Amino acid sequence: REAFKQPIGTFQANKHVMATFATELDIAQVYVDSLIAKVLDGTLSDIEASKAKWWVTELGKRVIDGCLQLHGGYGYMLEYPVAKAYIDYRYMTIGGGSTEIMKEMIGNDLGLAWRKRG
């Protein structure tokens, strides 16, 4: 896409957004790869899986939302793949346990479960 007769990717702010996304996705890939190794050797815990589901799906949601924003109004039109990705991906933070449920499980594992006294 172009704005002011130049590709939007050449604007400093947009380069910074894309650099952030690229870095965060690389870090997420390393994290997921380490967890795949644990799955393969049977040592992945429920809490590690919860942390991964929460972090990676929320990252994906931020990245897709940012890409939609970079596309401007076109990003909201279903003719563009980013709009379809935005619609399809939204389920990822809900299905299989919402982000809030993942955080609840992690918090309980940290010993922060509520206990009735008395």
Give each language-model segment a name.
Residues 1-118:
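Alpha-helical interface subdomain recognition
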